[in-house]
Amino acid sequence: MRIILITGISGSGKSVGLKALEDAGYFCVDNLPPTLLRALVTERLEEHGTTLAVSMDVRSASSLIGLPADLAWLRSQGHDVKVLFLTAKTDSLIARFSETRRSHPLSHRGFASDSTAERRTLTECIHEEREMLAGIEEIGHVIDTSGMRANKLRAWIKGLVESDHSPLTILFESFAFKFGVPLDADLVFDVRTLPNPHYDEALRPLTGRDAPVQDFLQTQPDATALLADIRGFVEKWLPAFKNDNRGYLTVAIGCTGGQHRSVYIVEQLAQYFRPTEHVLVRHRELD
């Protein structure tokens, strides 16, 4: 059976992710207590089910301690088990809670009346939740949903599901350093040393996906050399990542604004590796 467990920080999009899996044909259960996972799998097998997706959150934190053992047991029974851990930067989470007017699951007492106290209390809840789920984050594939719209997250989850038959999925992601390094990055490369198309008025409104920007960077020796170095590094160490039984490898490429140079490098890397590997692309500041 193909089993996907979605967990992570409150407000990071677990419900959206679970709905995407439901749309992909998975039998889904929301907020399943970890202690019931084995029984649910057994029940699905009796019903001849082939897929299962469950979400778990911090409200089951006390039971999550035994989850690694449960996952190991399921894998020993021949099941294909994947864990997706959704997270986001604290500012993004605060904004989402403000938009939805929902309370954090760990807010056991009411917020103070002034907005500063409310923000501080919510921040403390998020920090506490991160600490409680740290052990689970280590065993899952981390997806940073900061700034990611719901439709993009649905597409992202769909891409991951479609990669289930591939031993390793490479996620190439562009980003802007001024907005922070992606939380889900395994490898991070800085391409801010390359000539910046931003200073060319004709190229400024374009992105690294546009031909004029690509033509500009392809004529820059440093861009060609840096691209070759990054490509060579990933190519050299890819077998080691595969041998480590990883399901996903996230390669993050950063520049100043996340619009030109990092986007160009990501597109070139994806084009190079796509014929032989399962590749996904995300341009964080453009999507």
Swiss-Prot record:
Classification via HAMAP family: RapZ_like
Pfam annotation, one family: RapZ-like_N
Gene3D superfamilies for this protein: P-loop containing nucleotide triphosphate hydrolases (3.40.50.300)
Positions contributing to GTP binding: D57, V58, R59, S60
InterPro entries listed in its UniProt record: P-loop_NTPase (IPR027417), RapZ-like (IPR005337), RapZ-like_N (IPR053930), RapZ_C (IPR053931)
Molecular function terms from GO: ATP binding; GTP binding
Name of the protein: Nucleotide-binding protein HEAR2885
Reported function: Displays ATPase and GTPase activities.
Residues involved in ATP binding: G8, I9, S10, G11, S12, G13, K14, S15
Homology family: Belongs to the RapZ-like family.
Alphabetized UniProt keyword annotations: ATP-binding, GTP-binding, Nucleotide-binding
Organism, scientific name: Herminiimonas arsenicoxydans
